[in-house]
């Protein structure tokens, strides 16, 4: 069977082709009775608008690019952060009658392909996730004129509008909690130094300790469980007498719990542990993990609204966080 055309719908509804075009493209200038007749003809004939032709009329593709600057193996690992953000973004876009186009550039060639794709008019906006260091992509995408919003504060000098959680404040609350529990030799497992979440959570840790005159002790991780275990082992070697650790992610905190068990340290009797994120697994570690809850879904929903609104407001949106106290402290 041949695909029904605009002309066929117009003939069935008894109106012009231009009127049908306005109705199917969402124009509000058509008489309600005529609109009803056109929509009835569309349903009876099974007419489906041509996406390419429709985008020429509306100047919109109906798609939003979700650019994740991580290798696919990391995005689809056991880190629940990525799955929750991607799921929330897709659901929010579906509610707005949009779809997500997932892109994961992990090389300069991949970044160039993303830039060409966006500059070619294939998406109506871009959401950037998990930016690292002096990533050239934000500046390149901003030059295309397409609305661009970042999930998290960009570290690069190119600063698209962004939404984030209060990483500095959350780290402060975590370390202050450990001090209030009587802990005196508090170490940290920080995130990557080329990511704002890593930098800001380390800054919050150092701010609280500097106010007490205590020495800071840090080991660097990459937000994975394995890096948390390795960093914890290094911290115990550097300072066997430490009595608390603030890990900048829950996955690194679970790695720290594993390393502490292997070293024969009791949690929280010998070493108290605090994480950051409040992933579902934090309630089921042994012991259950004290952590800083960040509103991952709320941040993701806000970013979608920002990009759909055209990213006109450059004022950052920062969500508060909450300390969740469990048995690990």
Positions of predicted regions on the chain:
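Alpha-helical recognition/docking segments in bacterial nutrient-uptake
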Residues: 1, 63-67, 71-176, 241
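N-terminal helix-turn-helix DNA-binding module of bacterial transcription factors
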Residues: 1-62
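Short gly/ser/thr-rich secondary-structure transition/capping motifs
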Residues: 44-50, 107-111, 257
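Glycine-rich phosphate-binding loop signature in dinucleotide/nucleotide-binding domains
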Residues: 45, 181-182, 235-241
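Hinge/beta->alpha junction and helix N-cap segments in small-molecule ligand-binding domains
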Residues: 71-83, 102-111, 163-173, 189-233, ...
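Short acidic capping loops at alpha-helix termini that bridge into adjacent secondary structure
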Residues: 184-186, 214-215, 267-272
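Flexible loop/turn connectors
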Residues: 238-329
């Amino acid at each position: 069977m041949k695909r029904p055309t605009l002309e066929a719908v117009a003939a069935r509804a008894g109106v012009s082709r231009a009127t049908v075009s306005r109705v199917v493209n969402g124009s509000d200038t058509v008489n309600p009775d005529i609109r009803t007749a056109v929509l009835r003809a569309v349903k009876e004939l099974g007419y489906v608008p041509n996406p390419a032709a429709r985008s020429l009329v509306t100047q919109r593709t109906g798609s939003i690019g979700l650019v994740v600057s991580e290798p696919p193996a990391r995005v689809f690992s056991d880190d629940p952060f990525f799955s929750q953000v991607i799921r929330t973004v897709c659901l929010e876009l579906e509610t707005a009658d949009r779809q997500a186009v997932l892109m994961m550039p992990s090389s300069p060639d991949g970044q160039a392909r993303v830039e060409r794709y966006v500059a070619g008019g294939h998406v109506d906006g871009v959401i950037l996730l998990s930016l690292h260091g002096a990533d050239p992509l934000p500046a390149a995408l901003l030059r295309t004129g397409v609305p661009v919003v970042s999930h998290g504060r960009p570290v690069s000098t190119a600063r698209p509008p962004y939404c984030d959680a209060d990483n500095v404040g959350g780290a402060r609350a975590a370390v202050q909690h450990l001090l209030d529990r009587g802990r005196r030799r508090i170490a940290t497992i920080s995130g990557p130094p080329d990511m704002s979440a890593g930098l800001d959570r380390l800054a919050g840790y150092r701010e609280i300790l500097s106010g007490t005159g205590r020495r800071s002790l840090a080991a660097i991780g990459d937000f994975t469980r394995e890096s948390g275990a390795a960093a914890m082992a290094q911290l115990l070697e550097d300072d066997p007498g430490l009595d608390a650790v603030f890990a900048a992610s829950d996955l690194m905190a679970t790695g720290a719990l594993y390393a502490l068990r292997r070293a024969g340290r009791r949690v929280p009797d010998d070493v108290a542990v605090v994480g950051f994120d409040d992933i579902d697994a934090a309630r089921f570690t042994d012991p259950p993990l004290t952590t800083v809850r960040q509103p991952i879904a709320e941040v993701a929903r806000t970013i979608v609204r920002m990009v759909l609104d055209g990213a006109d407001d450059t004022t950052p949106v920062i969500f508060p966080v909450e300390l969740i106290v469990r048995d690990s402290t």
